[in-house]
């Protein structure tokens, strides 16, 4: 008459799929020595696996400023959960991120788009920002790398998110002044 404990462990699926109910099926053993327990029908137990996955983004800090002499800065970007539109009849489970510079006269960005799928969702993607020389002595100039979720994104939770932009500055390499060249030859007061 002793109770036996059965422990059920939840499994993390990295999907934003809400709490999932499943059943633990208990069946009698047809091979037991006590015939009263052969093929005994025991009620199944229903269990809820609580979803702990929240859609979002992980962005590492920028490595530093860019510079007008072509100096670069980098950061990485990834999604936090497996992209899934929860519709098994489609194959449109991507999260697409568009990347652009707020001021292309100060810095450009590569790549201009990232696409996260079920197979690469957990990969950190490096984004490189390259400084541009504007040939103006304007001091260090602030600008941003703009990150936007593309309208084609259908993965649960991602289409409504807006990742944080990355702010940085471009170090000025231009200095004010003028250049005087020497004149060849002599001048004449009579001219």
Listing of model-derived features with the role each one plays in the protein:
Residues 1-191:
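Short boundary segments that mark the start of a structured unit
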């Amino acid at each position: 008459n002793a109770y036996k404990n059965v422990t059920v462990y939840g499994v993390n699926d990295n999907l934003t799929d809400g709490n999932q109910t499943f059943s633990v099926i208990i069946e009698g053993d047809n091979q037991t020595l006590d015939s009263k327990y052969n093929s005994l029908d025991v009620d199944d137990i229903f269990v809820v696996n609580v979803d702990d996955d929240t859609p979002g983004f992980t962005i590492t800090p920028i490595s530093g400023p860019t510079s007008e002499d072509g100096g670069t800065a980098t950061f990485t970007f990834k999604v936090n959960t497996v992209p899934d539109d929860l519709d098994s009849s489609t194959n449109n489970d991507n999260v697409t991120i568009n990347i652009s510079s707020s001021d292309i006269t100060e810095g450009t960005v590569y790549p201009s788009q990232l696409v996260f799928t079920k197979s690469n969702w957990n990969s950190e993607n490096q984004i490189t920002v390259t400084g541009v020389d504007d040939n103006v002595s304007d001091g260090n100039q602030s600008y941003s790398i703009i990150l936007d979720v593309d309208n084609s994104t259908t993965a649960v939770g991602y289409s409504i998110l807006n990742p944080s932009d990355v702010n940085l500055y471009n170090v000025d390499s231009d200095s004010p002044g003028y250049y005087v060249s020497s004149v060849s030859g002599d001048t004449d007061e009579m001219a």
